[in-house]
Amino acid sequence: MNSILIKNVLFESQRVDILIVGNRIEKIGKDVEFIADKVIDGSEKGVFPTFVNMHTHAGMTLFRGISEDMPLSIWLDEIWKAETKLTPEFVYWGTKLACLEMIKTGTTAFADMYWYPEKGAQAVE
């Protein structure tokens, strides 16, 4: 089974070693002894258990690129025009994409507020 040992990484204000075997974190502590398949020097790195995004409009992910780098008033005008054409399916797929992006970056929980909340919830499941 694949194993990874991260040595001397910053975790919750202290330097520790983290042993991962397969897809499980097996041990977190000082001076973990294990012959791992891969050893990573974590002395210039930090780890975080998870992130929580407390303000999202996940369904808007598919609007990315509309009026970027514009003043807020112009951006809002463009987004509001686009939102007049929203469908439940659009929100579903936008939320699905947002969830995949959040998982990829370590976000495990989020508070969402957007149109068609039942479709957003369905995408999360």
What are these model-predicted stretches?
Residues 41, 53-55, 112:
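Acidic active-site catalytic centers that drive phospho-/nucleotidyl reactions
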Residues 45-46, 59-60, 66, 111:
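N-terminal hydrophobic targeting/anchoring segments and the immediately downstream early-domain regions
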